[in-house]
């Protein structure tokens, strides 16, 4: 199979065009330049420097210990390996506690190569989203299971089950878009609900454990490669390196599966 090539770098307008055209968007995490180059050359549209690095790189039990300094360091590394993909970066725990604090952290990340900032949650985070967007910073709103809220949630659990919870999540998604979010990431949400949200909103949705009805998919690279992170393997994960081959081949297989709709399958999704 030939190496994927994209003639144009991904931009915010390109995301909107993909939504209009029904083109699936492929996203993966990376934490260093070497893997970023592989993703960039093999069909990945958006590269996410996630605070998941706290668990899969640093070995913590959650993402809470990750600092802005950590995110700046890894973003700078990944940015050196990306040419075509858009670089999306998490604001770590409490870096978005206030609009001013979020702007300071986001600015530091943009200066080393970030092109979009991802923020977890709704509520007061809507003010943060608006504040950043008003200052020309594209924002991805992460809803559903938000790992930075693991202590409040009591663990990593499916969100939005039941009519009341589902309605609340749909309202949060609409509010995030109204606040200016360019992209929504839906994590561990029943597939039917994620599909409804995807229809509700004008911006693309990226799912992880949210079914095939989203506009795109994301996985943690270590999960896609079957690497042991020391944590239970989520239901939504598929090991694309299980039958051998190369890292590049596994990334291509994932990208192709997202685009042709074969991933995620029913076994990787949750129901209401």
Swiss-Prot record:
The record's active-site residues are 187
Q: Which cofactor does it need?
A: Mg(2+)
Binding positions (Mg(2+)): 51, 90, 120
EC numbers for this chain: 2.1.2.11
Q: What class of enzyme is it?
A: transferase
The annotated subunit structure for this chain is: Homodecamer; pentamer of dimers.
Q: Which PANTHER family would you find in this protein's record?
A: 3-METHYL-2-OXOBUTANOATE HYDROXYMETHYLTRANSFERASE (PTHR20881:SF0)
What is the recorded name of this protein?
3-methyl-2-oxobutanoate hydroxymethyltransferase
What species was this sequence derived from?
A: Xylella fastidiosa (strain M12)
Q: What is the lineage of its organism?
A: Bacteria, Pseudomonadati, Pseudomonadota, Gammaproteobacteria, Lysobacterales
């Amino acid at each position: 199979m030939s190496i994927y090539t994209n003639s144009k770098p991904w931009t915010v307008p390109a995301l909107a065009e993909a939504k209009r055209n029904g083109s699936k968007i492929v996203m993966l995490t990376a934490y260093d330049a070497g893997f970023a180059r592989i993703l960039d050359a093999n069909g990945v549209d958006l590269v996410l420097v996630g605070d998941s690095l706290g668990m899969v790189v640093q070995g913590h039990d959650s993402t809470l210990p990750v600092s802005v300094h950590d995110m700046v360091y890894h973003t700078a590394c990944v940015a050196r390996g990306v040419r075509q993909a858009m670089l999306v970066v998490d604001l770590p725990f409490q870096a978005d506690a206030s609009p001013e604090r979020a702007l300071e952290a986001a600015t530091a990340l943009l200066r080393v190569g970030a092109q979009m900032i991802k923020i977890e949650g709704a509520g007061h985070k809507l003010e943060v989203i608006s504040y950043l967007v008003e200052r020309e910073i594209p924002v991805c709103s992460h809803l559903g299971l938000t790992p930075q809220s693991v202590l409040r949630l009591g663990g990593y659990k499916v969100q939005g089950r039941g009519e009341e919870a589902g309605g609340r999540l749909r309202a949060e998604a609409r509010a995030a878009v109204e606040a200016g979010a360019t992209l929504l990431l839906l994590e561990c949400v029943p597939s039917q609900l994620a599909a409804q949200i995807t229809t509700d909103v004008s911006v693309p949705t990226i799912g992880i454990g949210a079914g095939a009805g989203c506009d795109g998919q994301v996985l943690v690279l270590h999960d896609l490669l079957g690497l042991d992170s020391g944590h239970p393997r989520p239901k939504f994960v598929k090991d694309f390196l299980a039958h051998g081959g190369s890292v590049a081949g596994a990334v291509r297989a994932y990208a192709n599966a997202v685009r042709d709709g074969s991933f995620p399958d029913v076994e990787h999704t949750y129901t209401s």
